[in-house]
Swiss-Prot record:
InterPro entries: Bact_microcomp_CS (IPR020808), BMC_dom (IPR000249), BMC_shell (IPR050575), CcmK (IPR046380), CcmK-like_sf (IPR037233), CcmK/CsoS1_BMC (IPR044872)
The name this protein goes by in its record: Carboxysome shell protein CcmK2
UniProt family annotation: Belongs to the bacterial microcompartments protein family. CcmK subfamily.
Main location: other
Domain remark from Swiss-Prot or TrEMBL: The tight homohexamer forms a pore with an opening of about 5 Angstroms in diameter and is positively charged.
Biotechnological relevance of this protein: Heterologous expression of 12 carboxysomal genes in E.coli (ccaA, ccmK2, ccmK3, ccmK4, ccmL, ccmM, ccmN, ccmO, ccmP, rbcL, rbcS, rbcX) leads to the formation of bodies that resemble carboxysomes, have densely packed paracrystalline arrays and RuBisCO activity. These structures open the door to generating carboxysomes in plant cells to increase their photosynthesis and productivity, as well as tailoring bacterial microcompartments to specific metabolic needs and molecule delivery.
Subunit structure, interactors included: Homohexamer. Interacts with CcmO in the carboxysome. Interacts with CcmN.
Keyword annotations of the record: Bacterial microcompartment, Carbon dioxide fixation, Carboxysome, Photosynthesis
Subcellular localization: Carboxysome
GO cellular component: carboxysome
Source species of the chain: Synechococcus elongatus (strain ATCC 33912 / PCC 7942 / FACHB-805)
Amino acid sequence: MPIAVGMIETLGFPAVVEAADAMVKAARVTLVGYEKIGSGRVTVIVRGDVSEVQASVSAGLDSAKRVAGGEVLSHHIIARPHENLEYVLPIRYTEAVEQFRM
């Protein structure tokens, strides 16, 4: 099964929480975590099957756009990321999220 990484970056924490909630409810993905970028920017990261991540990101975008005062800044899906990325970027499954893996 090809694995993908999906990310949504928002301006404002409530928008990223709403996006994350919608993402894990809409598809069989694992919430890897979130990164506070600074200046109110926050990125949420999910992993899973390519088609599931696509559905998840789509649902997250729709939900985040409905949050008052929140703003979606960017989003991206990386299908089949190189294994070396896991050691450089915060996309690795950790012990904290291992129990939630699909």
